[in-house]
Amino acid sequence: MSSNKLTRRRFLSTAAIGTAAIGTGFSFPRPAIAQPIQVSYTLSWLPTGQYAYVYAARQLGYFKKRGIDLDISRGFGSMAANQAVSIGKFQMGSAQAGANLLGIMRGLDLRLLGTHGYDATLGIVALKKGPIKTPKDLEGRTIGVSAAGGDTVFLPAYCKLAGIDFDKLKVVQIDSKILEQSAMSGVVDSVVVTGLSSIPNFISEDVPITMLPFSTVGLQFYWLNTITSGDFLEKNKEVADQVQAGINEGMKFMLLNPQEALERHLKEHEELALGKNGKLYVELGMELTRAIMMASESVEHGLGYTDLAKIDAQAKVVKQYAAKPTDRDPPAAETFCSNSQAEQVTLTSAEWDQVKSSTKKYRELLGSL
C-alpha cells in the first residue's frame, strides 16, 4: 500500500486550489494546555441517529481526554458543510465524499482526515403506491431536492447514466426539514436523498417506498469524511488528528454497543424521540450507519481508513459526470487525504462477526434498494 502513503510535507504544503478564500486563520498553542481546546465542528445534516457515534465520543470523554472540547453544530447539507469549513466558519466537520471531491475541484481548500462509512446510499425515493417504479418513470414528474445536499449535485449524472431526459423532470427545491414529508404528502412525486438520512423517516412512519439507487448506474461514493481546511491543518495538525482519533473511538463504541449508543443519543436529543415512532426513527439511522461502517477498508486497516485509490476513482466519476467545464481536474488523493489516525482503532475478528450479525437486516435493507 505504498502508493497510499502520504508524507507530512506533501500533505500540508498542498496549496489551496482555485480561488477559494480562507477565512479566519486558527492556530492553537503547542505546549501542554490545562483547559481543553474548543474546536467547532459541523455535521453535514441534522443530529439524527446516524451521528450517534460523534455524540457518544463526546459524552464518553474521547475528545476530552485528548484535550479537545468539540462544539458540534447541525448541518444543512454536505455542500454547505464543506463550504463553511473551507472558509473557516467551522474549523472541522463532516461531509459526503462525492460533495467533498466536487468542492475540491471547484476550488475549496479541503483536507480529508478519515472516512466514517463506505457507501453514501445516494438515490431517489418515491412512494411505493405511486407511479414511479423505474428510472424512466421520473420523466414528467416532480422531484424534490435539497439545494445544498451532497446528493443533489449528482441528479443530472444519474439521469444521463440511467437514460432519463433530465429536461423532462420538474425539479423543485425544498427545505431540508420537510424534504421527506413533501413526498409523503404528495407535494412532489419523488425526492433525491441520502438513504441513511431519509429512509428512517419513511420506515418509521410505515410508508412503503421505492428506492432508485445512484449506485446502480456507477455513482457510488464513500459516505462521510472528516474535513478541515488546509490552513487550519497546517497550523493545528495535532489538534485535527486528535479529533479524528476521538471519532474513530466513537465509531468503535457505536459498533459494539449499539443499544447504549442509542440511549445516549436519545438522552442528549430528546426532541428526536417525540412522537410514537421517534425512537425507531433514531434507531434506524444508527443501525443503517453501523452497516456501512463495515467494509474491507475498516476490517483490514482500522476504523477511519481511506483507500486513496478508491478516492482517486471516485474523483474521476465526479469529474466525468458532475463537474462543470470550468472545474479543474481532481488532484491526486495523496495531496488532500490522510490516514494518520488509521490502524489505531481496530476490531477483532470476533467483534466484526458480532457487527455483521447484528446489522444483517439493515444490510439487507440497503442491499434491496
Regions found by a protein language model. Name each.
Residues 2-19:
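N-terminal secretory signal peptides and thylakoid transit peptides that target proteins
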Residues 312-369:
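Conserved C-terminal helix/tail region of periplasmic/extracytoplasmic solute-binding proteins
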Residues 236-325:
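Secondary-structure end/capping motifs
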Residues 28-34:
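Sec/Tat signal peptide C-region and signal peptidase I cleavage site
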Residues 123-125, 225-228, 232-233:
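Short glycine- and hydrophobic/aromatic-rich loop-to-beta-strand nucleating segment
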